[in-house]
Amino acid sequence: MMERFEKIEMKIPAKAEYVAIIRLTMAGVANRMGFAYDDIEDMKIAISEACTNIVQHAYKEDVGEIAIVFGLYEDRLEIMVADNGVSFDFNNLRSKVGPYDISKPVEHLPENGLGLYLINTLMDDIQIMHDEGMTVLMTKYIQREQVENDGNPISTYNSY
């Protein structure tokens, strides 16, 4: 039996000024699902990096679209970010991304690949497919125990 989920789809122009719309939509969806604040902030960075890669690399001179699909499951949020532009070898670049030498000055860090490193670090799972364009599937699991253990109950009871 297939796992039940809700799906939200969006398409926006692949322009930097529209990335905030995707980020805010994702934050609203994640908040509604019960994600912790820190996890939402992590996902905002990851989705921004995935979309910025498309804006910078996918369409060259042309303006294309970014397709975003949110899969809302009981225990996780799956985020698919896709384009139909020119692919670069994401997996090859990803394999070159590793721990950064913190003893080196920030000016010596590699310029390309930091976004991939961030996505990989901030999300629970990431899958990359490239054929005609690029598709990045990112997954973040809801840490309900953290909310239950760390959350302070709010009461309207007046104790004085």
From Swiss-Prot:
Keyword Nucleotide-binding in annotation: yes
InterPro entries documented for this protein: Anti-sigma-factor_SerPK, HATPase_C_sf, RsbW
Gene3D superfamilies found in the cross-reference section: Histidine kinase-like ATPase, C-terminal domain
A molecular function GO annotation: protein serine kinase activity
Role played: Negative regulator of sigma-B activity. Phosphorylates and inactivates its specific antagonist protein, RsbV. Upon phosphorylation of RsbV, RsbW is released and binds to sigma-B, thereby blocking its ability to form an RNA polymerase holoenzyme (E-sigma-B).
Listed EC numbers: 2.7.11.1
Family, similarity comment: Belongs to the anti-sigma-factor family.
Keywords, sorted A to Z: ATP-binding, Kinase, Nucleotide-binding, Serine/threonine-protein kinase, Transferase
This protein's name: Serine-protein kinase RsbW
Enzyme class: transferase
HAMAP family reported for this sequence: Anti_sigma_B
